[in-house]
Regions:
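Extracellular and organelle-lumenal recognition/adhesion modules and their flexible linkers in secreted
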Residues: 1-274, 279-290, 294, 302-347
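ATP-binding pocket architecture of kinase catalytic cores
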Residues: 297
């Protein structure tokens, strides 16, 4: 209920069928005809996220703002970012979403560093709107404003314009974390990690792994989010499948495998959130990676056999959360043979 909203907007609170408490923000007559966006929920730059410290390198130089919105009108939701340092406050960039036409617009002097996306829940009508900003250390502190903006075609507010908002979040990293309803304080959830032994499931070449993956992010939130990763393998014999990171947003999040030094990448998977992906190792050691019908070139692995103590970790690398996927995995399949190229071309 404690929204730090702008003046000229009234708010009423309700709870939806999923137990999300939300606010309806309605434009009053005293600001009708104005063009400036109005705050719903804000974190000022001087109270925001420090993008200069060690966390910048462990979590990546990103901050993410997100919330769920809906309206019967074509008003826009706006996510605005600002910086704060010794020079004071400076506007960085905006992400706009029109709530009926679903037009997405990114503006501002640092627009090239901003990525935004949205998802619509057809059952509830809620639109999940998220924006991720790649930060520069000289910015100091970064804050955000979650706002209502006027219909782009009209250009100004009308009395009675409204937007409903729930689950506002602002956090370090390149994706929003899970939101959990509690009876005490809000909490987030670390991604899950499970293991299974490689021994008795496979031994030597040939073999093929295939799995369905849904990512909760568009920009890599760590150096290399893992789908699977091996533990206790012999020297030079790791099993790795996941996503690579890049300083260039258009090349970030490519899928890859690394099997005994055979590192194969599929750049066509950059920016895709739902994939059927995997890797294949032929009897002669020739290894490829594949994702959504795209197959990489092959190179030869030095891997030869399974060590008895080796296990496969699903969803991350360590129990501390290092290189966790932050996504969903299903239908993990393994064959003790090399599937054909045609068989590798499943896709979501």
């Amino acid at each position: 209920d404690a929204w730090n909203k702008s003046g000229g907007i009234s708010v009423t609170s309700s709870t939806d069928e999923f137990e999300f408490k939300y606010g309806r923000f309605t434009v009053g007559s005293d600001i009708a005809g104005t063009t400036t966006g109005r705050n719903i929920c804000t974190v000022a730059g001087n109270k925001g996220i420090d993008v200069t410290g060690d966390d910048q390198y462990s979590k990546g130089p990103y901050v993410t703002a997100s919330f769920r919105v809906r309206s019967d009108l074509n008003v826009r939701a706006r996510i605005r970012f600002e910086r704060y340092n010794s020079e004071g406050y400076t506007f960085l960039c905006d992400a706009y979403l029109s709530l009926q036409t679903h037009e997405l617009q990114i503006t501002g002097g640092n627009a090239q560093l901003l990525t935004a996306n949205f998802e619509i829940d057809p059952g509830s009508g809620w639109i999940y709107f998220q924006a991720t900003l790649k930060c520069l250390p000289e910015w100091g502190m970064v804050g955000t404003q979650l706002q209502i903006a006027a219909d782009r075609a009209v250009g100004s507010f009308a009395t009675g314009d409204w937007i409903e908002v729930t689950t506002p979040q602002f956090e370090y990293g390149a994706c929003a974390t899970s939101f959990i309803i509690t009876t005490t304080e809000p909490a987030t959830r670390a991604s899950d990690l499970c293991k299974f032994p490689l021994m008795k499931n496979m031994y030597t070449m040939p073999f093929t792994f295939m799995v369905e993956v849904h990512k909760n992010w568009f920009i890599s939130h760590n150096a290399a989010p893992r789908v699977i990763d091996s533990e206790n393998h012999q020297s030079g014999g790791p099993f790795i499948m996941g996503f690579g990171s890049s300083g260039t947003i258009s090349q970030d999040g490519y899928s890859y495998c690394d099997i005994g030094g055979a590192n194969r990448r599929v750049y066509e998977s950059c920016g895709v959130r739902d994939l059927v992906m995997g890797f294949r190792v032929k009897a002669d050691g020739m290894t490829c990676s594949f994702a959504n019908k795209h197959i990489s070139t092959e190179t030869k692995t030095v891997w030869k056999y399974i060590r008895e103590a080796a296990v496969i970790r699903i969803g991350g690398q360590t129990t501390t959360g290092l290189r966790h996927l932050n996504g969903h995995i299903k239908n993990l399949r393994f064959w003790n043979r090399a599937l054909s190229d045609t068989q590798l071309k499943e896709y979501v």
